[in-house]
């Protein structure tokens, strides 16, 4: 999903997507993962937020809420909140769940709450996007979503369209605001 959203962002010549992931959270107090992943995209650091002009965050859904690694990351952003570093910047959210009733909308809303506290300008996907009318899997007006199922199904055509539309929308808002 992040790659498809990034494709939407990158379609704007004035914007460049910076895709990041987060390490897992462990009850073990010793380091359980390398500081830099051996493969894939780099881990996000709160310092990445200082340079962003717009922010799109995503998380799998667990019991209708964002995953612990994202919550842990967002809980470390108090210095950015105190300085107002993210005020007025556009933001959006996306999620994937394993079941149709996996709480996609509540997961999306849970990710929005810290962004509201940061003073970010939250945007979803408008109903002018055909994918919202055609999908029978994911995509909501609250943000992009994916119904992965138990077998980890690939993104549907409509989910890809919604992801790219969300990226394009945030890129356009970022350009308009800057």
What function would you assign to each model-found segment?
Residues 1-85, 139, 147-178:
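N-terminal beta1-alpha1-beta2 submodule of the flavodoxin-like/Rossmannoid cofactor-binding fold
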Residues 87-140:
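Short, glycine-/small-residue-rich phosphate/pyrophosphate-handling segment
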